[in-house]
Amino acid sequence: MSGHNKWSTIKHKKGAADAKRGKVFTKIIKEITVAAKLGGGDPDGNPRLRTAIDKAKGENMPKDNVERAIKKGVGGLEGTTYEETTYEGYGPGGTAVLVEVMTDNRNRTVSDVRSIFTKCNGNMGESGCVSWLFDKKGLLVFPKSIDFDKLFEASIEAGADDVTDEDEQYEVLTDPAAFHQVKTALEGAGFKAESAEITMIPQTMVKLEGKNAENMLKLMDRMEDNDDVQNVYANFDISEEEMEKMM
């Protein structure tokens, strides 16, 4: 299984995704608000907002919530002002970790993030210490029920960089600038993605087992539980056998 999707698969198996639905809504609302503030309230002219709205639809978020977040972003409603930043560090076993946050209190957030790193046998690093180990990409995930050859052909024709056949799904990778063009073209050709996002994909993976694997999952869980954290990316790989031991 490709590493960049390892964490979402693990969460699904643990049944953690549904339990954190409320937090997912909160994070998407923040993203919509900031995207609208920076690029305007029209998704057609604001790719970042369009991606956030698509994510909201994928989570079945009520339309009212989406519209309220856009209004707040463009100044139609009073609300908290968020600052975006990315923290970098090392997880168990020398893994590389990127933590994207949106916060109204940077001091609180940096303290929380540093504490999570420390408690999970990792440490927070300087800006730039691990970001070079990741590439920003558009990622579309498709079910195995569709025809791979047809998906491959349509994806490359639409401008995708690569299409891979993974253990449990097909993955289409794009340049971030071509993400919406590829997604729209594939939808037009009848291919419905299970998920579609701009993400950070690790160039190399670090295999973890035993205590390191346990601490890594704990770190990912705690980071995602933090209200200020929007996304966490890490280059760990844990085998199916190792996962079974921990569950």
UniProtKB/Swiss-Prot annotation:
Q: Write down the SUPFAM superfamilies for this protein, in alphabetical order.
A: YebC-like
Q: Name one GO cellular component term.
A: cytosol
* InterPro entries (alphabetical): Integrase-like_N (IPR017856), TACO1_YebC-like_2nd/3rd_dom (IPR048300), TACO1_YebC_N (IPR049083), Transcrip_reg_TACO1-like (IPR002876), Transcrip_reg_TACO1-like_dom3 (IPR026564), YebC-like (IPR029072)
| Record's subcellular location | Cytoplasm
What are the transmembrane regions?
none
Asked if the Swiss-Prot or TrEMBL record annotates the protein with the keyword Cytoplasm, the reply is yes
User: Which terms are listed as keywords in the entry?
Assistant: Cytoplasm, DNA-binding, Transcription, Transcription regulation
GO MF term list: DNA binding
An example Gene Ontology biological process = regulation of DNA-templated transcription
Q: Tell me, what's a Pfam family for it?
A: Transcrip_reg
- Show the Gene3D superfamilies listed in the entry: 1.10.10.200, 3.30.70.980
Q: Which family does it belong to?
A: Belongs to the TACO1 family.
The name under which this protein is listed is Probable transcriptional regulatory protein Gbem_3313
Record organism: Citrifermentans bemidjiense (strain ATCC BAA-1014 / DSM 16622 / JCM 12645 / Bem)
